[in-house]
Amino acid sequence: MELGKSIENHNDVVVRLTKHVIATVANGSNLVFSPISINVLLSLIAAGSCSVTKEQILSFLMLPSTDHLNLVLAQIIDGGTEKSDLRLSIANGVWIDKFFSLKLSFKDLLENSYKATCSQVDFASKPSEVIDEVNTWAEVHTNGLIKQILSRDSIDTIRSSTLVLANAVYFKGAWSSKFDANMTKKNDFHLLDGTSVKVPFMTNYEDQYLRSYDGFKVLRLPYIEDQRQFSMYIYLPNDKEGLAPLLEKIGSEPSFFDNHIPLHCISVGAFRIPKFKFSFEFNASEVLKDMGLTSPFNNGGGLTEMVDSPSNGDDLYVSSILHKACIEVDEEGTEAAAVSVGVVSCTSFRRNPDFVADRPFLFTVREDKSGVILFMGQVLDPSKH
């Protein structure tokens, strides 16, 4: 499979995941999540699984092997520098019970291919310490944006665990054309229930990457680039009730994101987008099971290639995959982070069109040269943090 096809498949999985998350757990709220974080964790689980479980995960990810996901990741990680205005880091962590040991082949894969840190812990006697350790790891690898991924309510689950796998994604990008904070003013944002809230809107007088399509507009806001080029895309329905039809359209058109990219800067009339900052967390394993990925979560989940044990890992299964993401968009740029933890057990414009994002919209953060989507979400109410 060519790299381009792998990325296209990855983005198709993104859309499927987004539709299911919105339909089942978003409950009419703001949403942000990192599909790449969930996919990396699934890839890591596949690498430690027997053939049946591995094949089901790879089929879900629409990839022939875990190597293809590593190639996708390389497209967005490579190219950064310490002094860059753009920061992207993806980290993996593994915690294994002190009475078990990782199979050498799996440990080698974790450390060399996934660059994962591995620690031995006492799940049964010191579950609170394990929770603190995982949460500290998440905080460090998201630059403090996510301070807790495991709650105290998970003590019983942790106490009976053998293995905890975690992935963290952190992104911070500065706009290539920043907004002047002195021009930020409060305006009405119209909610789905017909009411409105006053929120700060950013604006500037620069030309914008903007294009109109049937029923919606797309705005591209580039970040300062290094060897990579990241952008935020805002997909704004023309109608206040147009979000659901737009999501349906995105899900029904192959390569939607590649086919709806504003390529030219144009003069814009009224131009306003809201500042927003929020987090979202959900049990990703429940969504994945609803989508047909069941094998890793069943008793005898086939995680036979992970640990050395008398049962050869036959009794291991993934009890849950927890995902938490947060995002902040302001005049300077975007800061976003996500952590996934798996516990084993074109229409032409009239002149100077407007772009006023004063109603619910979808967004992505994507690397433009490869097309990889890093974050995706919806903004229903920017006043909710």
Swiss-Prot record:
InterPro entries: Serpin_CS (IPR023795), Serpin_dom (IPR023796), Serpin_fam (IPR000215), Serpin_sf (IPR036186), Serpin_sf_1 (IPR042178), Serpin_sf_2 (IPR042185). One of its GO terms (molecular function) is serine-type endopeptidase inhibitor activity. Keywords: Protease inhibitor, Serine protease inhibitor. Pfam families: Serpin. Residues 333-357 are annotated as: RCL. The record marks T347, S348 as: Reactive bond. GO terms for cellular component: extracellular space. The reactive center loop (RCL) extends out from the body of the protein and directs binding to the target protease. The protease cleaves the serpin at the reactive site within the RCL, establishing a covalent linkage between the carboxyl group of the serpin reactive site and the serine hydroxyl of the protease. The resulting inactive serpin-protease complex is highly stable. Probable serine protease inhibitor. Belongs to the serpin family. This is Serpin-Z10. It comes from Arabidopsis thaliana (Mouse-ear cress).
